[in-house]
Amino acid sequence: MSVAGLIFSNIHNSAIPELTSVRTMASVPYGCRYRLVDFPLSNMVNSGITKIGIITHNNYQSLMDHIGTGKDWDLARRSGGIRILPPFIAAYSNANAAKLYSTRLEALMGVTNFISRCTEEYIVL
């Protein structure tokens, strides 16, 4: 069974604004060594998923610095691997192009290009 993975990097940003004002929730440190994104990434890689996209919203520079090429998860590959998916503002609506997505469905609509290029049979969110 072929599976790709998608991770939302900003799911609970509003829960702790003190920590997420300059970084996304996925890049919040845990245990002084890890970031919160490490856990879903490791779970996906250990389950055999080798193509993973991380949907971002804002303040994702520290996430990009932490992920790097994906070498720590054996995701530095030519095909598959890891992709940072920044918000694509006009992907789903021309009505309000200045507004970023506010729901998960709108975020998924913004990464339809990534989803449509996936040759995998399933996508895990």
Place the predicted regions along the sequence by residue.
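Short aromatic/hydrophobic "clamp" motif used to bind/position activated sugar donors
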Residues: I123-L125
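Active-site nucleotide-sugar/metal-binding loop of Leloir-type enzymes
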Residues: E106-E121
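Short loop/edge segments at beta-strand edges and connector loops
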Residues: P86
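A short, glycine-/small-residue-rich helix N-cap motif at loop->alpha-helix starts
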Residues: Y92-L108
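N-terminal glycine-rich phosphate-binding loop and ensuing alpha1 helix
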Residues: M1-I82, A90-A91, L105, R117
